[in-house]
Amino acid sequence: MLPLNATIVQINEESPLVRTFFFDFQFETMEPGQFVMVWVRGVDEVPMGLSSKNSITVQKVGEATSKLFELKEGDSFGLRGPFGKGFSLPSEGEKTLIIAGGVGAAPLAPYAEAARSAGSEVHTVLGARSAGDLLFEKRFAEAGKVYISTDDGSKGTKGFVTDVLTDLDLSVYDRIAVCGPEIMISSVFRLLKDRQVLEKSEFSLQRYFKCGIGVCGACCIDKSGLRVCRDGPVFSGVQLLDSELGKYARDASGRRVKI
């Protein structure tokens, strides 16, 4: 698949290191949780989760994302996709819990909106380092009740999303959707397992991608061999039992890197 040319029509600064780039067309069939391969001309092609049908939300962390931050309205980049498996939508009347940390809120914001539209009662636990780093709080609030946690206590509960979850009755939820830094995801995974609600959960994983379509095997998960780009990036909690989650990932050479 050749990249589509995406012209930037609007840039929102969500925080000093996070921006949302809106482009001039929509992925009408996008499932919340799917990703696109973003071709930053002259630099690299990198995977990004969609934060709406016509936007990606980018955290400045490396060469490719730094180059994206140099782009202005009217500039363009290439897009391939959407790829992968997104989050499963709830049925009408079901109760959904969303657990979002940092830039992991980006793919979960459209999921919250879609779940609400499907007739689900939506609750969100939204975490970040500080109040200024909270992403899409308004979008989550429009979908339902929001619980906030910040590392520094500048808003909501001081601590992590797991501190909020400890005080919630998780048995009342029919579906639980999780996305965020892997250290957060692994902590949530253990908590959900201990509370015996893991079978209700889905997690979005980040791994190094090369092809983005399941051919190269660079993003396979030990021990199952599931491909994050093709079989994921969203997996059920049960699928991730006895996996590498929270332990290590692989770099571009395939070498294990401790998380």
Swiss-Prot record:
InterPro entries: Cyt_c3_hydrogenase_gsu, Dihydroorotate_DH_Fe-S-bd, Dihydroorotate_DHASE_ETsu, FAD-bd_FR_type, FNR_nucleotide-bd, OxRdtase_FAD/NAD-bd, PyrK_electron_transfer, Riboflavin_synthase-like_b-brl. It comes from the Archaea. This is Probable dihydroorotate dehydrogenase B (NAD(+)), electron transfer subunit. GO terms for molecular function: 2 iron, 2 sulfur cluster binding; electron transfer activity; flavin adenine dinucleotide binding; metal ion binding; oxidoreductase activity. The gene is pyrK. Residues 1-89 form the FAD-binding FR-type domain. Binds 1 [2Fe-2S] cluster per subunit. It holds the Pfam family DHODB_Fe-S_bind. [2Fe-2S] cluster binds at residues 211, 216, 219, 229. PROSITE patterns: 2FE2S_FER_1, FAD_FR. Responsible for channeling the electrons from the oxidation of dihydroorotate from the FMN redox center in the PyrD type B subunit to the ultimate electron acceptor NAD(+). The keyword Flavoprotein applies. NCBIfam families: PRK00054.1-1. HAMAP family: DHODB_Fe_S_bind. CDD domains: DHOD_e_trans_like2 (cd06220). It comes from Methanosarcina barkeri (strain Fusaro / DSM 804). GO terms for biological process: 'de novo' UMP biosynthetic process. Its cofactor is [2Fe-2S] cluster; FAD. Keywords: 2Fe-2S, Electron transport, FAD, Flavoprotein, Iron, Iron-sulfur, Metal-binding, Pyrimidine biosynthesis, Transport. Belongs to the PyrK family. Heterotetramer of 2 PyrK and 2 PyrD type B subunits. Pathway: Pyrimidine metabolism; UMP biosynthesis via de novo pathway; orotate from (S)-dihydroorotate (NAD(+) route): step 1/1.
